[in-house]
Amino acid sequence: GDLPICGETCFEGGNCRIPGCTCVWPFCSKN
């Protein structure tokens, strides 16, 4: 159950594994 990294698919409101990335559906992106 690892969190997605930048560039991977995520769910709205979800978290990303790497600090400085946020979930902007449908992908984790750098802030």
Swiss-Prot record:
Key words, A-Z: Disulfide bond, Knottin, Plant defense
Origin: domain of life: Eukaryota
Cross-link (Cyclopeptide (Gly-Asn)): 1-31
Disulfide bond recorded as keyword: yes
InterPro entries listed in its UniProt record: Cyclotide (IPR005535), Cyclotide_sf (IPR036146)
Post-translational modification: This is a cyclic peptide.
GO BP annotations listed: defense response
Cystines in this chain: 6-21, 10-23, 16-28
Domain remarks: The presence of a 'disulfide through disulfide knot' structurally defines this protein as a knottin.
UniProt function note: Probably participates in a plant defense mechanism.
Similarity comment: family membership: Belongs to the cyclotide family. Moebius subfamily.
Name of protein: Cyclotide glopa C
Native source organism of the sequence: Gloeospermum pauciflorum
